[in-house]
């Protein structure tokens, strides 16, 4: 450092010293200035000070940095010089003085250690990435989390669902207003199961049989409801006077009177006749035994309980005809009713239990199901047991409650309309209540409900016969209050006429019944006639489905049902005169001369009918046959002039009696009746009063047989048509028929002398009106009972000062005389005097419910509308008009000709043949309908299937009314349903009435349990519509008496529950338990809303005793069912050669474990078991809104049709169009249920499309109707639970749920499917479908583009045309590749063309066809067996299958088959897997790789790393659920000794487990279990594939051939001799297997038997390539083995086709789905 620098530093220091005092001085002066508050330099001084402070701060910082930098630089320079100069120099110098010696061995060992450590490091870090792809460790916890999440999802709907189960009126049966009305009762805590809520629930459960009820209707129906308590043992007589009874607490036994043995045998013999016999021959054989009065009724004057018929008029007529036929000349003959047949017997005939002595105790009777009543009132047998929540009244009793009031109107003083339970109409018991009910009902019909006290007193005094003393009534003590005597002695019944009904109820326990009295139904019918008709329609439908259908299909009582139509034709008489018949016949003949009758006469309506019933092949054959025979159909609407407004309104209350001029247009010849053609004619015969009717006063005075209708004579030529209604041969005669016989001249005048305008007086109008009047007559409709009296629906009493009495007791005659009767007197609201203001306010708040009834709903208007729909049809002889068990077409009135009514039965030797042809059925003629008769009556009432077949016996001319028109008009003129109910109930036979009392209608909501395993079997069930799942718990079978009590045991038992199957519409179950008197062997749970018919065990036993034919029929059905179930599980025969057995097919394979650690699935353990996956109803439900549901459904429906399934798709639009005006009505639920049940019968598959918002009722309907729910989701969307899915969970449905993931491209991102499935434990299966949705999105985005983009899109559209493609192809040949690539990049960047995705070239690989085959139970499976390198031939078999166009829907494999099958299932394409398999074979055949993998042979010779890596290189991170095609592989669990089936998890891991050959590879560890090769238990898993629902299976076996050479070496064996024997070429003894070979054979014992069983499995195509010359480890011969498989596959499939053994491949001959956009998909080129 020099002196200049020192001087410079000293100057700086001195300068700083001079500055500091100045700074301090300035600061001090500044402070003084501030203190003084004055000074002009304050601002300048402050600014100077701030600048100085900033300068000083930055100076200090810079000084510190400069000093630190200088020190760091000097230090670093020193360290670098030390390391680079001094230290190396020291090492070099010192190294010259040090000497190190290392031996070569140490060097080699050191290098080996370094190499091994490096290799293990690289192997563990880089080459073992597959180890991270382990199995899901916490499977149990995952499932528990899923269940918890599902429970959380259900938690939101817990209260609503609990209320839904308890309130049976939830949106389906009763209105929401009903919920509101009872919200005070049910609105409390659901956990409090109080008696009151239970009572209301039971009542609502029973009243649901009425269907939907409006709130005012429900209030009026139930406001007079009573409750009655019955002590145990008390007996309730069931007749119409009781009303509608419901058991709300306890149990009630229903008893039916025991039929006498003689009658029983006679009747049973009637229905055990030969096929050639008919009902007419039966009746003719019985005719001499029974006689009738001139009324056509039977008077049984026997004692109560013993009905011995005798002749009344003494004349027994005999017929000379061989078979009685219904013809116009024989309708005056009296046919005995079945009621009389069953109630007549000789005095000498004993009871059914004649072996029992009269001294048999009552307890013995009760033990056998019988009870006896005192004083000879009869013996009764148990029919059914009614529990709480079920109605006591039968369906016919309910109909009688509505129709009985009408009888009171027509005959106020009659003896009473007879209940079906009574035998004698004269001796019907009457009481004060019954009288008051009848007169009240009569007043209701006349619009005068309120009675003055004078009228009431007059009624009680003027009818003393009906007011018998209550003290003398034996029934007044039979059902009494708690204070009365319980068992009084009955007084003798000589003083009064009294009969016990045939059906009684006895309290099995202390019970409570709720009763709606009959006057409530009478008032309901008068006040709300439309609602009453809806109830009647509901009851008629249930009567048809429950009673008729069960009797027809299950019990075989078709003749009983057909007898109803026989009685109708015998009872009602309406025949057309000959001149009208000639009009019809001549017109058909004229048309036949000029033109083809088939084309010229078929009306649009009839052609529509023919096309509507092509749902199945049977209907197609029938309709095609009928279309050939149907010669002509005359549409009268073409020629009939339209009525003017003036002519259509001419009908007035006062009839106009004008003449009727008919112009006969079609006469081509002269007939004797031509003189009458220009004479005023009436279609109704002007008969004398004695022939037309009788004065009602005369009937009051006379009850003798002379007061009957005269017999009808045969129609003569030119005779006018006559209306003559026969009285019903049953005792309960309908009022609609008695109306025609009344002596009221004004009414008869209105009917017989209806005037018509001049426009109507044509031949068409005459024929039309005549046919309509005939059909309405058969329906029980006339002008009197179709009129609506004015003021009857006003709802206000005619006399404001009247009052009504509401009885407290059940029936006034039943009340005990000891207890005083309490009467509540109620005054009308008019008695209260309120202010006008309050009255107006109350009137505004309350909206009065009033049904809108058109004033044109009278007989004449109905007749005119019916006439417009009448058609004339002509059938040739032998034409099948209506076939049995097909939809009835409508109502037929026979104008001329004969129709045979036949029924078809299956012969006994064919009942077990499931493949029988329908032509082999026996046909039996029941009766014949001649001119003037009616056909198709029952099937047209509810528009359902016909129970019989109608065949034209001769050329037949009929008047036809289509069922669509009949249903529409009956719905408009709703009073027709009342008349139909009257007619139908009067025609039912006693046996049908007994069935109606005993059969129960059950309705189950989704997830409801019908019965549990271990419950007593109390009946047989027949599924009317819906679906049930059968569950079985093996643990409960082992210990049936010990049931788990705590939650843990219940959970464990639930895990072991297995699904045995599912039952659909028309199937029955429970017969085995009832026949064997054992408990239920399984549980039944409703998959969706289900309706069932229950045949009680007591009824079945009763029918078995009375009618053995029914018992035989049911036994055959049970035997057939058991035989069908046992064929799959029966012991297969042992296949042997001579006396040496070769295969024992009964050796069982270890089943797949059902525990959670062995089940690799996200759902149930049986999620993949689809052996009965023939779903009838499928619902397509999106997970969230915005998905193309309709487009997807359209493709799926089209695919179903291509695979041969008759399918219909339903969305909200099609359903609303069917419902018509009821679309938004509360009646839509009832209409929907019938419509859906009908579609399930017409079509094999019904697809419900949920195309509405989530809160829509249609969405809920789709979920409730589904056997299988398909959840639609877009694969690349978020896997969160959508709003539709939450609705599905809230519905608590147990239907099978499938997830469909839609992909734009035919590839799946690894792990993507798991994200969808792990949070959805309710999903049973999933599918990957290619469905390009960008087309829909891009089409909507075109509108938002600008003008330039629109021009480019126009160019793009031109390119897509055919001309544009040709031009583009020609240009592309001339341009170089570089220019073409530039143009393509430009177009893709600027023109925004639609993205094009790849689809497979082969059409049979269509994803929708694959989904349709799986859902319809027609899936095609491929099973690839194990065999080491021999399995490389699988690739050649796959190539042959693809070239043949055979699709594969499911793939399964073992060992090498699992590897090849997994690769094929992953891509579903042969080209990309070829290279992967070849690469894997090269790695395995590499000697150096195998040597590098050797280890110490304790467990195996290799570590398995190279093998694992080879598999992982082929599959990567892909999981099995990511495979495009469904796939599974098997393995052997040596820890649990079971077979494992893997369909979820990482693919490489379980494929490796299936290929783990013992000794060569170590077992795969999976959740604590060791897995080995699946070939040890089943080398060809065909049975698993069969259990998954595959109908056709191609099984490829490449295993080694078993050495079955017989050995003979004695009882001891020397090892040295074995070695010498192997070396000796001249030895005759075969080589003895070594220990290793014996162990291998021992391991494959189960597999060998499984293979033989798989070969004999139906539907399996066994393929065995010639690969015996190749060893297990010959992977180096890839090309050779592959070619062997390809060549053999082509030859094998070709031979199958030539020999006709190739199975039918559904959809193989169909083109691709027609609506796929061809320009939207591209085909993948054939390159790896």
Swiss-Prot record:
The chain crosses the membrane at residues 45-65, 98-118. Keywords: Endoplasmic reticulum, Hydrolase, Lipid degradation, Lipid metabolism, Membrane, Repeat, Transmembrane, Transmembrane helix. The active site is at 1455 (nucleophile), 1573 (proton acceptor). Pfam families: cNMP_binding, NTE_Ploop, Patatin. It catalyses: a 1-acyl-sn-glycero-3-phosphocholine + H2O = sn-glycerol 3-phosphocholine + a fatty acid + H(+). It is a multi-pass membrane protein. A nucleoside 3',5'-cyclic phosphate 2 binds at residues 983-1121. One of its GO terms (cellular component) is endoplasmic reticulum membrane. Residues 66-97 are lumenal. Inhibited by organophosphorus esters. Residues 345-367, 1036-1049 have a biased composition (Acidic residues). It is an enzyme of class 3 (hydrolase). A motif (DGA/G) lies at residues 1573-1575. A nucleoside 3',5'-cyclic phosphate 1 binds at residues 854-987. Gene3D superfamilies: Cytosolic phospholipase A2 catalytic domain (3.40.1090.10), Jelly Rolls (2.60.120.10). Residues 1422-1586 form the PNPLA domain. Residues 141-150, 610-628 have a biased composition (Low complexity). A motif (GXSXG) lies at residues 1453-1457. GO terms for biological process: phosphatidylcholine catabolic process; regulation of phospholipid biosynthetic process. It is found in: Endoplasmic reticulum membrane. Residues 293-303, 326-336, 406-424, 454-479, 599-609, 642-657, 729-756 have a biased composition (Polar residues). Residues 1-44, 119-1728 are cytoplasmic. SMART domains: cNMP. Belongs to the NTE family. This is Lysophospholipase NTE1. It comes from Candida glabrata (strain ATCC 2001 / BCRC 20586 / JCM 3761 / NBRC 0622 / NRRL Y-65 / CBS 138). The lineage of its organism: Eukaryota, Fungi, Dikarya, Ascomycota, Saccharomycotina.
């Amino acid at each position: 450092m020099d002196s200049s620098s020192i001087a410079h530093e000293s100057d700086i220091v001195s300068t700083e010293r001079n500055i500091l005092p100045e700074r301090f001085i300035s600061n001090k002066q500044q402070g003084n200035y501030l203190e003084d508050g004055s000074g002009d330099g304050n601002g300048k001084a402050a600014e100077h000070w701030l600048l100085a402070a900033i300068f000083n701060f930055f100076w200090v910082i810079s000084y510190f940095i400069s000093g630190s930098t200088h020190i760091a630089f000097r230090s670093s320079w020193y360290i670098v010089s030390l390391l680079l100069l001094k230290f190396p120099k020291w090492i070099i110098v010192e190294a010259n003085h040090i000497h190190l010696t290392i031996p070569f061995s140490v060097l080699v060992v050191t290098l080996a250690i370094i190499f091994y450590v490096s290799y293990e490091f690289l192997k563990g870090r880089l080459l073992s990435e597959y180890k991270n792809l382990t199995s899901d460790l916490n499977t149990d916890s995952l499932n528990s989390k899923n269940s918890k999440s599902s429970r959380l999802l259900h938690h939101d709907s817990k209260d609503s669902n609990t209320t839904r189960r308890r309130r049976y009126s939830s949106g389906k049966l009763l209105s929401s207003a009903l919920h509101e009305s009872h919200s005070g009762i049910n609105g409390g805590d659901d956990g409090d199961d109080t008696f009151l809520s239970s009572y209301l629930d039971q009542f609502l459960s029973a009243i649901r049989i009425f269907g939907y009820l409006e709130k005012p209707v429900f209030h009026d129906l139930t406001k007079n409801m009573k409750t009655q308590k019955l002590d145990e043992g008390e007996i309730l007589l069931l007749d119409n006077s009781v009303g509608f009874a419901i058991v709300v607490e306890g149990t009630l036994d229903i008893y039916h009177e025991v039929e006498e043995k003689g009658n029983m045998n006679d009747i049973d013999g009637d229905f055990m006749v030969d096929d050639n016999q008919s009902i007419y021959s039966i009746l003719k054989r019985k005719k001499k035994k029974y006689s009738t009065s001139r009324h056509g009724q039977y008077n049984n004057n026997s004692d109560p309980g013993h009905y011995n018929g005798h002749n009344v008029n003494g004349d027994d007529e005999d017929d000379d005809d061989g078979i009685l036929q219904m013809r116009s000349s024989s309708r005056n003959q009296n046919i005995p009713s079945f009621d009389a047949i069953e109630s007549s017997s000789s005095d000498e005939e004993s009871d059914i239990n004649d072996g029992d002595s009269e001294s048999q105790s009552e307890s013995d009777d009760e033990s056998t199901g019988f009870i006896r009543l005192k004083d000879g009132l009869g013996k009764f047998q148990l029919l059914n047991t009614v529990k709480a929540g079920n109605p006591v009244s039968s369906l016919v009793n309910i109909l009688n409650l509505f129709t009985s009031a009408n009888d009171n109107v027509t005959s106020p003083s009659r003896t009473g309309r007879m209940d079906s339970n009574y035998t004698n109409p004269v001796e019907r018991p009457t009481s004060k209540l019954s009288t008051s009910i009848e007169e009240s009902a009569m007043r209701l019909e006349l619009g005068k409900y309120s009675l003055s006290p004078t009228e009431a007193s007059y009624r009680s005094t003027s009818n003393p016969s009906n007011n018998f003393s209550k003290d003398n009534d034996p029934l007044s003590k039979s059902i009494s209050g708690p204070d009365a005597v319980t068992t009084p002695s009955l007084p003798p019944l000589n003083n009064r006429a009294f009969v016990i009904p045939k059906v009684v109820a006895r309290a099995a326990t202390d019970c409570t019944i709720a009763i709606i009295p009959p006057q409530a139904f009478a008032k309901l019918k008068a006040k709300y006639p439309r609602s009453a008709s809806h109830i009647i329609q509901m009851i008629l439908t249930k009567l048809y489905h429950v009673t008729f259908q069960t009797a027809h299909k299950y019990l075989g009582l078709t003749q009983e049902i057909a007898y109803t139509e026989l009685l109708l034709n015998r009872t009602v008489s309406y025949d057309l005169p000959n001149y009208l018949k000639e009009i019809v016949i001549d017109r058909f003949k004229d048309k036949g001369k000029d033109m083809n009758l088939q084309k010229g006469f078929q009306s649009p309506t009839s052609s529509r009918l023919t096309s509507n019933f092509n749902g199945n092949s049977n209907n197609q054959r029938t309709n095609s046959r009928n279309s050939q025979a149907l010669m002509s159909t005359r549409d009268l609407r073409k020629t009939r002039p339209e009525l003017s407004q003036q002519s259509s309104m001419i009908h007035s209350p006062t009839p106009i009696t004008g003449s009727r001029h008919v112009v006969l247009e079609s006469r081509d010849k002269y007939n004797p009746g031509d003189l009458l053609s220009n004479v005023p004619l009436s279609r109704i015969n002007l008969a004398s009063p004695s022939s037309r009717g009788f004065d009602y006063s005369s009937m009051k005075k006379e009850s003798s047989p002379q007061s009957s209708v005269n017999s009808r004579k045969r129609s003569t030529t030119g005779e006018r048509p006559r209306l003559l209604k026969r009285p019903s041969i049953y005792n309960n005669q309908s009022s609609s028929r008695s109306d025609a016989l009344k002596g009221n001249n004004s009414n008869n005048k209105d009917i017989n002398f209806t005037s018509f305008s001049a426009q109507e007086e044509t031949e068409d109008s005459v024929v039309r009106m005549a046919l309509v009047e005939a059909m309405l007559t058969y329906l029980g409709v006339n002008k009197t009972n179709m009129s609506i009296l004015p003021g009857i629906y006003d709802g206000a009493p005619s006399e404001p000062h009247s009052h009504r009495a509401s009885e407290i007791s059940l029936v006034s005659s039943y009340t005990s005389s000891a207890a005083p009767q309490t009467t509540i007197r109620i005054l009308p609201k008019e008695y209260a005097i309120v202010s006008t203001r309050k009255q107006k306010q109350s009137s505004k708040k309350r909206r009065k419910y009033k049904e809108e009834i058109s004033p044109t709903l009278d007989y004449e208007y109905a007749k005119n509308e019916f006439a417009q729909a009448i058609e004339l049809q002509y059938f040739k002889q032998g034409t099948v008009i209506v076939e049995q068990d097909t939809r009835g077409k409508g109502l037929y009135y026979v104008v001329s000709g004969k129709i045979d009514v036949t029924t078809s039965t299956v012969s006994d030797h064919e009942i077990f043949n499931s493949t029988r042809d329908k032509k082999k059925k026996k046909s039996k003629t029941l009766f014949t309908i001649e001119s003037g008769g009616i056909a198709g009556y029952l099937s047209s009432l509810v528009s359902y299937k016909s129970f019989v077949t109608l065949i034209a016996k001769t050329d037949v001319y009929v008047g036809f009314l289509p069922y669509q028109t009949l249903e529409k008009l009956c719905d408009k003129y709703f009073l027709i349903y009342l008349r139909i109910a009257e007619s139908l109930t009067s025609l039912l036979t006693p046996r049908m009435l007994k069935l109606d009392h005993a059969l129960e209608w059950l309705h189950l909501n989704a997830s409801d349990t019908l019965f549990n395993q271990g419950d007593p079997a109390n009946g047989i069930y027949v599924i009317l519509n819906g679906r049930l799942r059968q569950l079985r718990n093996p643990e409960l079978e082992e210990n049936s008496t010990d049931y788990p009590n705590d939650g843990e045991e219940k959970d464990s038992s639930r895990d072991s529950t297995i699904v045995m199957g599912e039952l659909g519409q028309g199937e029955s179950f429970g017969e085995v338990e009832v026949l064997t008197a054992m408990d239920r062997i399984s549980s039944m749970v409703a998959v969706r809303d289900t309706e069932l018919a229950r045949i009680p065990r007591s009824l079945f036993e009763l029918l078995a005793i009375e009618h053995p034919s029914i018992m035989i029929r049911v036994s055959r059905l049970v035997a057939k069912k058991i035989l069908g179930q046992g064929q799959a599980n029966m012991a297969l025969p042992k296949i042997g050669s001579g006396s040496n057995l070769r295969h024992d097919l009964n050796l069982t394979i270890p089943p797949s474990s059902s525990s959670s650690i062995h089940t690799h699935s996200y759902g149930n353990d049986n999620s993949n078991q689809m052996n009965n996956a023939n779903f009838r109803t499928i619902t397509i439900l999106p997970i969230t809104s915005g998905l193309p549901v309709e487009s997807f459904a359209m493709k799926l429906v089209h695919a179903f049709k291509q695979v041969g399934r008759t399918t219909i798709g339903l969305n909200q639009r099609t359903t609303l169009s069917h419902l018509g005006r009821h679309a938004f009505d509360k009646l839509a639920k009832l209409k929907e249920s019938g419509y859906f049940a009908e579609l399930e019968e017409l079509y094999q598959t019904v697809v419900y499309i949920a195309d509405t918002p989530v809160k829509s009722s249609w969405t809920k309907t789709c979920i409730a109707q589904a056997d299988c729910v398909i959840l639609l989701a877009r694969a690349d969307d978020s896997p969160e639970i959508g709003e539709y899915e939450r609705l599905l969970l809230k519905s608590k449905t147990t239907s099978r749920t499938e997830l469909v993931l839609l992909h734009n491209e035919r590839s799946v991102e690894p792990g993507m499917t798991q994200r969808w499935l792990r949070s959805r434990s309710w999903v049973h299966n999933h599918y990957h479908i290619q469905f390009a949705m960008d087309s829909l999105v891009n089409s909507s985005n075109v509108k938002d583009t600008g003008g330039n983009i629109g021009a480019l899109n126009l160019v793009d559209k031109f390119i897509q045309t055919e001309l544009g493609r040709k031009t583009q192809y020609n240009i592309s040949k001339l341009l170089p590749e570089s220019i073409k690539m530039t143009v393509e990049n430009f177009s893709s960047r600027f023109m925004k063309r639609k993205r094009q995705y790849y689809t497979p070239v082969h059409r049979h690989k269509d994803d929708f066809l694959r989904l349709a085959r799986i859902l319809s139970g027609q899936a095609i499976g491929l099973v690839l067996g194990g065999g080491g390198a021999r399995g490389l031939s699988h690739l050649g078999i796959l190539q042959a299958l693809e070239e043949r166009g055979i699709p594969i829907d499911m793939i399964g494999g073992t060992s090498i088959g699992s590897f090849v099958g997994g690769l094929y299932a992953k891509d579903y394409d042969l080209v990309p897997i070829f290279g992967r398999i070849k690469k894997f074979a090269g790695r395995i055949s590499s000697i150096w790789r195998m040597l590098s993998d050797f280890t110490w042979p304790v467990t195996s010779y290799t570590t398995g790393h190279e093998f694992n890596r080879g598999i992982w290189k082929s599959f990567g991170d892909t999981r099995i659920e990511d495979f495009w095609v469904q796939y599974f592989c098997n393995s052997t669990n040596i820890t649990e000794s079971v077979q494992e089936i893997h369909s979820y998890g990482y693919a490489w891991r379980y494929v490796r487990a299936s290929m783990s050959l013992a000794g060569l590879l170590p077992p795969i560890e999976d959740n604590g279990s060791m897995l080995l090769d699946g070939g040890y238990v089943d080398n060809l898993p065909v049975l698993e594939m069969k259990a998954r629902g595959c109908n056709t299976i191609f099984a490829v076996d490449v295993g080694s051939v078993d050495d079955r050479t017989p050995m003979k070496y004695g009882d001891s064996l020397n090892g040295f001799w074995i070695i010498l024997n192997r070396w000796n070429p001249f030895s005759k003894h075969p080589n003895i297997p070594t220990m290793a070979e014996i162990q291998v054979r021992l391991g494959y014992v189960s597999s060998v038997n499984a293979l033989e069983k798989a070969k004999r499995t139906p539907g399996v195509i066994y393929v065995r390539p010639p690969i015996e010359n190749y060893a297990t480890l010959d992977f180096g011969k890839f090309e050779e083995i592959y070619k062997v498989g390809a060549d053999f596959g082509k030859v094998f499939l070709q031979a199958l086709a030539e020999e006709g053994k190739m199975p039918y491949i559904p959809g193989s001959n169909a083109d691709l789905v027609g609506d796929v956009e061809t320009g939207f998909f591209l085909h993948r080129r054939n390159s790896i």
